[in-house]
Amino acid sequence: RRAAAPALPVASATFLTTFLDFSDTGVLDVFIDEAFVKLREMQFGQGGLMPGHDLAATFSFLRPNDLVWNYVVGNYLKGETPPPFDLLYWNSDSTNLPGPMYAWYLRNTYLENNLVKPGHARVCGVPVDLGRIDIPVYIYGSREDHIVPVTGAYASTRHLPGAKRFVMGASGHIAGVINPP
């Protein structure tokens, strides 16, 4: 029931639009390579913060027609006030990330996919083995997700030996989670 060191038992786990296996990251593959990760390690690897607004802008530009240009045309060119939209408000409330954690995450997940290699990823010095997580899991993927493609979310099922339920829903990364499937 444990992925690494002894811990309190957990009855089940839920993964909503989440990668465990980073072998199919969709369009993000275009942006994350060795040079990019080294740059981020130099910038943030020893301390500091990854500004949340930078990360939010990255995700917005993965769907520029919907999340950027639509507002440039409406707000800037036409002078229209956008209608209130709870999902976009929530999406704009970004969180800064600890720099060393962000640099570790890029290298160990997106670049090297170490989370699915038993013992290759270490958290607080403890090797992680997803194959030891033998609890029931619920995994949800959104069909139009631009951050975690549904095929990437589904790939997690190969690495968890316990009972699994995978649900594919409609919509995108955020809306798919909060709307019924």
Predicted features along the sequence, with ranges:
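Acidic/polar loop patches that form or flank catalytic/metal-binding clefts of enzymes
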Residues: 7-12, 83-84, 116-118, 162-169
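Catalytic histidine neighborhood in serine/cysteine hydrolases
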Residues: 106, 160-181
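Short beta-strand/loop motif that positions the catalytic acidic residue
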Residues: 133, 139-141, 145
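Conserved alpha/beta-hydrolase "acid-adjacent" motif
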Residues: 146-152
